[in-house]
């Protein structure tokens, strides 16, 4: 079989021109995120296919330890919901102020028994509002948007496919691929040579499981509300700050009761029971999370298998599951 994606190709990089649009987030009719002891069990996720092995599952199962990146506890947050736990890896490299804010709020127990006050099928689940006030926010300064970053060649983002930056402004295209196990997009790093600062713009994508900050029409208004996407939402690209990614528990997000508290006072939303910084848990209670290194030979082989199963062409980068291994703590 001809290898479609060599490790050399995976070493490429990419990013995009920051767009700005301000959707009318206060209008609930618009689809934008708005403000207002047994042995430990290991599990590996790499996508499933209706009772059959997912493409590349054999490669994932046999990948050497060197092909996996262990996620430090400092990067992990655990959201406890009425439907189960959601494990999130944060991305301070892309949104340092937002990650710091949500860590601070978790330490202050701000989210305890807040609600998922706006949950839309095929879109996202927004949380952080109060049962009696869906527009509630923490008494914190508003954050400046961290929609994109500027980077040089020392930060690698793989270039796998072309992508429209934002379909609402179909005027520019970028390249899409992976950074550190996150789906990302970027201007081609080759363009850095013609930039005064030697850098290009890059951002994390709104694929399913993206964790981002909710805001009003003001791009610099995020405070404490957040949302988790339940599907790919490309119309939000580069206009909302993505600060994390669900590594386990997306099914709990997708099972949340749907509705909008601001529009239907009879809606009974699910609760956020707690948000925990994994590093604050006793060592014996911390899960071990490993994400396949998306610059490794094993991931290149995995991509090749995924492409071969799809007629020789990679699917949309948002439809490619990044393999994750989780070692749960002993109960």
Model-derived regions: residue spans:
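Bacterial N-terminal signal peptides that target proteins for export
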Residues: 2-14
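C-terminal motif of bacterial Sec signal peptides marking the signal peptidase cleavage site
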Residues: 22-24
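Cyclophilin-like peptidyl-prolyl cis-trans isomerases
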Residues: 26-331
